[in-house]
């Protein structure tokens, strides 16, 4: 039986090859066929979940929390020292130089990443801005958010920190970083569908030992996962879910 492994649509295209290399190594470690899928957007990701096509998923913390609570997905591993932070930015030649310069009625470029938006809204509370005060403009990718800011299609833009720092130096020089979150408790998780519960320990061993060889270390570094994965403890999961609920309130 082939196992279906879905990757959240949160990563730049240059990571695609790296995920396929990781999947090849995973198949060797667990001695089972694994079919890798890269969701192109949040809607496609949800469709695969709704169709019950997902056995393993690398999900953002907000989706992971929902999958654990509502569909009984099992936590497998989390990346070590790799947190989900976000950045609010403006165009370098914009008059917006700090959060205090953001005013009601301004437009904001963002992707479908709900986690990025939710963290941004919490940061904007500091300057008395809430969701209804802004005009939200959907962008297909973080690169598109950057282009939109440079082309004056929006006043501010939202990025995953990892995506922002992967932009070219020239692109970043044309942007102004207003604020970067420092939560340090949010991270993507690898989850397992409960119907595959018998695979849990095998998967945990495979992911947590992937960095133990030079080849494994190299492929993880190519994905920005320099310190590899570690098995999730029960208290880690409980803390993450509590934090998600706090951010949503």
Region spans (language model):
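Periplasmic-binding protein-like
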Residues: 1-9, 81-90, 172-210, 225-243
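Bilobed "Venus flytrap"/periplasmic-binding protein-like clamshell domains
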Residues: 3-29, 85-146, 162
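Short helix-initiation/N-cap motifs at beta->coil->alpha
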Residues: 36-47, 132-147, 184-185
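Acidic, polar ligand-binding/catalytic clefts
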Residues: 47-101
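A ligand-binding cleft/hinge motif common to bilobed small-molecule-binding domains
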Residues: 58-70, 148-174
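Short hydrophobic/aromatic-enriched beta-strand-loop microsegments
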Residues: 74-79, 131-136, 157, 176-180
């Amino acid at each position: 039986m082939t196992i279906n492994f879905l990757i959240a649509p949160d990563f730049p295209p240059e990571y695609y090859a790296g995920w396929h290399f990781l999947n090849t190594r995973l198949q060797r470690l667990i001695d089972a066929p694994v079919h890798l899928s890269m969701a192109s957007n949040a809607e496609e990701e949800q469709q695969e979940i709704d169709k019950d096509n997902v056995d393993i998923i690398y999900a953002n913390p907000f989706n992971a929390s929902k999958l654990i609570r509502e569909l009984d997905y099992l936590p497998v591993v989390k990346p070590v020292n790799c947190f989900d932070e976000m950045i609010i930015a403006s165009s370098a030649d914009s008059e917006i130089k700090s959060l205090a310069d953001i005013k009601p009625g301004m437009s904001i470029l963002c992707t479908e990443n709900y986690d990025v938006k939710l963290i941004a809204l919490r940061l904007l509370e500091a300057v008395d801005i809430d969701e209804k005060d802004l005009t939200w403009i959907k962008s297909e990718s973080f690169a598109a958010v950057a282009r939109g800011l440079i082309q004056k299609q929006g006043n501010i833009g939202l990025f995953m920190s990892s995506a922002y720092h992967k932009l070219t130096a020239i692109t970043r020089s044309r942007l102004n970083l207003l604020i970067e979150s420092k939560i340090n408790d949010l991270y993507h998780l690898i989850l397992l569908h409960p119907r595959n519960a018998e695979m849990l320990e095998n998967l945990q061993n495979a992911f947590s030992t992937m960095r133990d060889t030079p080849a494994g270390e190299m492929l993880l570094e190519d994905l920005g996962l320099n310190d590899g994965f570690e098995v999730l403890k029960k208290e880690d999961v409980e803390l993450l879910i509590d934090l998600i609920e706090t951010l949503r309130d």
